[in-house]
Amino acid sequence: MPAPRYKSGSSKKVYRKAPGNSSIVHYRRKKQSKAVCGACGALLNGVPRGRAVEITKLAKTEKRPERPFGGNLCPKCVKKMMVAKARNF
């Protein structure tokens, strides 16, 4: 039986070969999924992938791009939105 801390869904099983041709199980923390655009669902560049504990240690400029809606929308969607707002203004 695995220890209770390894039964969580946030742990990932990794099988390793040990000397003597026996296999053992290592447990690793799963990575967070990649950030996606809120409008079109495209993957966002410049946004780190990791657990919240790891991301809080990064500087503010390393967490997301320094532009309007950086980290939430992709550049194409931001451009479309700004053009649409300028035309309706």
Swiss-Prot record:
Pfam families: Ribosomal_L34e. Belongs to the eukaryotic ribosomal protein eL34 family. Keywords: Ribonucleoprotein, Ribosomal protein. PANTHER family: 60S RIBOSOMAL PROTEIN L34. It comes from Methanococcus maripaludis (strain DSM 14266 / JCM 13030 / NBRC 101832 / S2 / LL). It comes from the Archaea. GO terms for cellular component: ribonucleoprotein complex; ribosome. One of its GO terms (biological process) is translation. This is Large ribosomal subunit protein eL34. Disulfide bonds: none annotated. InterPro entries: Ribosomal_eL34, Ribosomal_eL34_C_sf, Ribosomal_L34e_arc-type. One of its GO terms (molecular function) is structural constituent of ribosome. Residues 1-22 are annotated as: Disordered.
